[in-house]
Amino acid sequence: MNTIVFNKLGGAVLFEDRGTPDRERGSRTFSGFLDNPHTGPEVGIPDGPPLKDNLSLRHRRTGARQNGGKVRHKRQALQDMARPLKQWLYKHRDNPYPTKTEKILLALGSQMTLVQVSNWFANARRRLKNTVRQPDLSWALRIKLYNKYVQGNAERLSVSSDGDSCSEDGENPPRNHMNEEGYSTPAHHTVIKGESSAIKAGGRPESRAAEDYVSPPKYKSSLLNRYLNDSLRHVMATSTAMMGKTRRRNHSGSFSSNEFEEELVSPSSSETEGTFVYRTDTPDIGSTKGDSAANRRGPSKDDTYWKEINAAMALTNLAQGKDEVQGTTSCIIQKSSHIAEVKTVKLPLVQRF
C-alpha cells in the first residue's frame, strides 16, 4: 500500500509499502531524527535567536546610515549658522571682541542665541591661541596663519559665501576690501600717492584708475583764476574809462567844484580799482619850489607836458586879474597813469598898468 505525503512546498512525495519491518524501521529513523536535538543545526534549519540577530544587524546598519545623514545635515547647518560669525571675525581680525550690540545683531543674523554667539567667539579665540603657539603675534596674524598650523579634522576658518569669498590663510586678500580701495575717488594728491604705494605693495591694478581723477584743489584753483581774470578785465576797463575822463578834464583847463565833489563821491574811485583823487591846500606859493616838490612826489610819464600846462594856466590867471590883489587857481598834477592830484593854490596877481 502506498502512502502519499504532502510536504510544505506543496509537492507530493510517494512512499512505497515495503512491509511492516521496513515501515517500522523507517518510522524509527524518522522519529529518531525528530527526537535528536543535535541534528537541527547540522541540517541547517535556523533557530529563533540567529534570525533576530540578523534582523537587528540590518536595522542597525540602516539606522547608522540615517544617523550619518543627520550628522552631516546638522554639521552643514552649524556651518551655515557660523558663517556670519566667521565673516565678522575676519573683517575685525585686528580686534576680535564684538560689543553687546554687535553680538545681538550677529545672533539675529545667524539664528543663534546671545550666549551661543559669545561662546563661539570665546572658543574661536581659544583655538587661535592654542593652534598658533607664538606669543608675540597679533590677532590678525594668528587668523591668517591658523589654516597653516591646523591639523587633522579640526575646523578651518575659511569663509565662503555668495556675497564675498575670502580665505584667511594670508595668501589671497579679501575681494571686497580690494574693490572698495581700488575704486575710491581720491580727494588730494596724498591719497593718490598712497594708492600708488599700495599698488606697488599689493599689486592691485584696479586702483590705477584713481590717478585719472582731478583733485579738488586744482578745480578750486581754476575757478579762482577765472574769477580773478574776470575781475582784472573789469578793473582794466574801468581804469581806461577813468583815464579818458581825466585827460578830457586836463585839456579843459581846470576842475569845477561840482565835478571835483562828484569825483570824490563817485564809486569809480574805489580802492579795488586803484584810482585815487585827493586835494591839498597850500597857503602860499612864492616860487616854483613847491611845484617842483609836488612834482617829485610820484613818477610821471611826461613831466614837460604837465609843466607847460601849469605855466599856461598861471599865465592865464595872471592876465585875467585886474583889480584883485590875490586870487586862487587850480593846478593838476599827474601822479601816474591812474592817479591824479588836484591842488588849489593862492597866487599874488600882478595889476595891469
Curated annotation (Swiss-Prot):
Any one GO BP annotation for this protein: positive regulation of collagen biosynthetic process
DNA-binding segment(s): 71-132
Matches recorded under InterPro entries: HD (IPR001356), Homeobox_CS (IPR017970), Homeodomain-like_sf (IPR009057), KN_HD (IPR008422)
Keywords in alphabetical order: Developmental protein, DNA-binding, Homeobox, Nucleus
Compositional bias (Basic and acidic residues): 18-27
Full protein name: Homeobox protein Mohawk
Region (Disordered), start-end ranges: 18-50, 157-183, 243-302
Subcellular location(s) of the protein: Nucleus
The family this protein is said to belong to: Belongs to the TALE/IRO homeobox family.
A molecular function (GO) term: RNA polymerase II-specific DNA-binding transcription factor binding
Function of the protein: May act as a morphogenetic regulator of cell adhesion. Participates in the early events that lead to differentiation.
CDD domains, alphabetized: homeodomain
A single Gene Ontology CC term: transcription regulator complex
